[in-house]
Amino acid sequence: MEFWESSAMPDDVKREIKEIYWEDRKKLLFCQKLKSYVRRILVYGDQEDALAGVKDMKTSIIRYSEYLKKPCVVICCVSNKSIVYRLNSMVFFYHEYLEELGGDYSVYQDLYCDEVLSSSSTEEEDVGVIYRNVIMASTQEKFSWSDCQQIVISDYDVTLL
């Protein structure tokens, strides 16, 4: 700490270190927040809380996208088919819920899926299979993968790419 406070380190270097630290901290907090929303969505039995979790997740992603000034895409990349089904179905239920309330659809609420999961496959076929679905994009209907922030929901974590 003494070195940090001494004049040996220029102010612009200190400022750069602080910016990098706070950017990493924001990313970590954002991932933790998304993990809590995924847990809320995956809890069976409490439909209202799961819908609220979907809404909160979308709101957080939209805000983060606006902060970054680039589109964010959530990708579900898990080996458990039931998790993929649950996340996808909760997003669809949220769309129906908005329709019932008379809400209008904006690009923020569009759903993108890159593959359809077949329900006819057996458990033996599913061993070692990774299901990859793009669940939602936040600010644009069309986007470039290289220009967007990818948020990956995996079996054990939520990460930013």
From Swiss-Prot:
What are its GO biological-process terms?
Answer: symbiont-mediated suppression of host innate immune response
Alphabetically sorted, this entry's keywords are:
Host-virus interaction, Inhibition of host innate immune response by virus, Suppressor of RNA silencing, Viral immunoevasion
Q: Does the keyword Cytoplasm apply?
A: no
| Stretches for region Binding to host SKP1 protein | 9-21
Q: Subunit info?
A: Interacts with host SKP1. Interacts (via LXCXE domain) with host retinoblastoma-related protein 2 (RBR2). Interacts (via LXCXE domain) with human RB1. Interacts (via LXCXE domain) with retinoblastoma-related proteins (RBR).
Function per UniProt: Interacts with and disrupts the function of host retinoblastoma-related proteins RBR, which are key regulators of the cell cycle. Induces transcriptional activation of E2F-regulated S-phase and G2/M-phase-specific genes. Inactivation of the ability of RBR to arrest the cell cycle leads to the stimulation of viral DNA replication. Acts as a suppressor of RNA-mediated gene silencing, also known as post-transcriptional gene silencing (PTGS), a mechanism of plant viral defense that limits the accumulation of viral RNAs.
A Pfam family per the record: Clink
Q: Among its keywords, does the record have Nuclease?
A: no
In chain numbering, where does the motif LXCXE motif, interaction with host RBR fall?
Answer: 111-115
Put simply, this protein is called: Cell cycle link protein
